[in-house]
Curated annotation (Swiss-Prot):
Pfam families: p450 (PF00067). Its main location: endoplasmic reticulum. It comes from Sesamum indicum (Oriental sesame). It is a single-pass membrane protein. Coiled coil: none annotated. This is (+)-piperitol/(+)-sesamin synthase CYP81Q1. PROSITE patterns: CYTOCHROME_P450. The chain crosses the membrane at residues 3-23. Keywords: Endoplasmic reticulum, Heme, Iron, Membrane, Metal-binding, Monooxygenase, Oxidoreductase, Transmembrane, Transmembrane helix. Its cofactor is heme. Involved in the biosynthesis of (+)-sesamin, a furofuran class lignan. Functions in a dual catalytic mode. Catalyzes the synthesis of (+)-sesamin from (+)- pinoresinol by formation of two successive methylenedioxy bridges on (+)-pinoresinol and (+)-piperitol, respectively. Belongs to the cytochrome P450 family. It is an enzyme of class 1 (oxidoreductase).
């Protein structure tokens, strides 16, 4: 019965579509001829959706090699324009920065994933978004605010280093680096947000921590899931909306969890947390700083701020394990500028130029969000001489731009040294986006990654678990995780033994 209904609905949709095509006026047809080129294989109703493979950024890269630096595809009836060159990105976010400052509005509830009209990531461009961005810049990511959380970042770093030392104090031991980096990053964020630690041995059996870990795991799974109902709305009419139901349930559970956090902080003594600070702002401006606004900000920070830092640190360590000479050069820089009597600190990071080059090269090869967050023009515009109508989804394939041989010498190779002699231009290296919708948390993410990476290099010797190189295959998702969990062999460096014993209280 369901199959018959689906067939009838698709047949009806096809018929309506063909009538629309026949009745389209000539001006519309002339406008369509000025769109960026499209790949062959378009089909009625589904467009080019059947051509999309698991790793979207690679599929789009393949299209760009045949069609050029700007092309168009159809996800169902939705027009999507893909930009894959640094010069066109510069045009987009200088000439058309305001026009492209909008976000496509999802037809399903994604607020528990950080993409909603109440979050700085997903809000449409306008006064509301400007207020959210100002709030992020002045209250959440302000240098003084981040400096007030420095002790948390150092303490979580010390906990990770101590755990690794206890595992490997007798000699080389295999460690699950991904798990350690996840624990470091999520505990960092949640202590800043609400003075909570939800990962680690002491939180293993805590019910609240379990709820948070389950919600986070579900969120990361849902971000990588596709929703056919957004491409083919008719499927919703037929009840084929399993993902939408999962998102609705996840949003409800996330709202309940976050409301519990807010209520707990209202009842308790004021602390140096982001939740407490936002609640204090709510007292003076309750009409704006609603619980919904605060929840949207916090959820976006948790989802966007953690996963990107985790995958970047994991990719960096994977690349270093495959390039021991680069690892040794970074270690020598740390030994020279920091020494062996203390651990690297955040105030050292500006001096550690080669370490910064490693982070930049990692972000070049494996940008945490390879196609960035989509944009949507608020009016018709032209990009690269082609028409881009209002309401089009515009994707920037940062992954492709970062591997463009016209921009980068030997683009597929891991060469941090390239950044020692070249100036970074934002339209060529854009892991955090560009223009007014660029990621507001880029500075915090780089602090996380730089401190974690520097500490791992300074304190331990690292080797691969086998002679084979680390697998650099990419996993699926909105972010760019490794396909395989990173495991490595580590042992304490002899010259850091004294410091490691102090950190580990042994």
């Amino acid at each position: 019965m369901e199959a018959e209904m689906l067939y009838s609905a698709l047949a009806l949709t096809f018929a309506i579509f063909m009538v629309y095509r026949i009745l389209s006026n000539s001006q519309d047809k002339r406008s369509l001829t000025k769109l960026p080129p499209s790949p062959p294989g378009w089909l009625p109703v589904i467009g080019h959706a059947h051509l999309m493979k698991n790793l979207l950024h690679r599929t789009l890269y393949d299209f760009s090699q045949k069609l050029g630096p700007i092309f168009s595809i159809r996800f169902g009836s939705r027009l999507v324009v893909v930009v894959s060159s640094s010069s066109l990105v510069e045009e987009c976010f200088t000439k058309y920065d305001i026009v492209l400052a909008n976000r496509p509005q999802a037809s399903v509830d994604r607020r528990s994933l950080g993409f909603s009209t109440t979050s700085v990531i997903g809000a449409p461009y306008g006064d509301h978004w400007r207020n959210l961005r100002k709030l992020c810049d002045l209250e959440v990511f302000a240098p003084t605010r981040l400096a007030s959380f420095l002790s948390i970042r150092l303490d979580e770093r010390d906990r990770m280093i101590s755990a690794l030392y206890k595992i490997s104090s007798a000699g080389f031991a295999k460690v699950n680096l991904e798990a350690k980096i996840v624990e470091l990053t999520f505990n960092n964020i949640m202590r800043m947000v609400a003075a909570k630690r939800y990962y680690g041995e002491e939180a293993e059996d805590d019910e609240e921590a379990k709820r948070f870990r389950d919600l986070t795991k579900e969120a990361l799974e849902l971000t990588s899931a596709s929703n056919p109902g957004e491409i083919f709305p008719i499927l919703r009419w037929l009840g084929c909306n399993g993902l939408e139901k999962k998102l609705a349930v996840h949003s409800r559970k996330t709202d309940e969890f976050m409301q519990g956090l807010l209520d707990e902080h209202r009842r308790g003594e004021r602390q140096n947390t982001m939740v407490d600070h936002l609640l204090s702002l709510q007292e003076s401006q309750p009409e704006y700083y609603t619980d919904e606004i605060i929840t949207g900000l916090i959820v976006a920070l948790i989802i966007a701020g953690t996963d990107a830092s985790v995958v970047t640190t994991e990719w960096a360590m994977s690349l270093l394990l495959n390039h021991p000479k680069v690892l040794e050069k970074a270690r020598k820089e740390l030994d020279t500028l920091v020494g062996h009597e203390r651990m690297v600190d955040e105030h050292d990071l500006p001096k550690l130029r080669y370490l910064h080059c490693i982070v930049l090269e990692t972000l070049r090869l494996f940008p945490s969000v390879p196609t960035l967050v989509p944009h949507e023009p608020s009016e018709d515009c032209k990009i690269g001489g082609y028409n881009v109508p209002k309401g089009t989804m515009v994707l920037v394939n940062a992954w492709a731009i970062h591997r463009d041989p016209k921009v980068w010498d030997d683009p597929l190779s891991f060469k941090p040294d390239r950044f020692e002699i070249m100036e970074v231009e934002t339209h060529k290296l854009l892991p955090f986006g560009m223009g007014r919708r660029a990621c507001p948390g880029a500075g915090l993410a780089q602090k996380f990654v730089g401190l974690a990476l520097g500490s791992l290099i300074q304190c331990f010797d690292w080797e691969r678990t086998s002679p084979e190189k680390i697998d650099l295959n990419e996993g699926s998702g909105i972010t760019l995780p490794k396909a395989k969990t990173l495991e490595a062999m580590c042992k304490p460096r002899h010259v850091m033994e004294k410091v490691l014993r102090q950190v580990s209280n042994v």
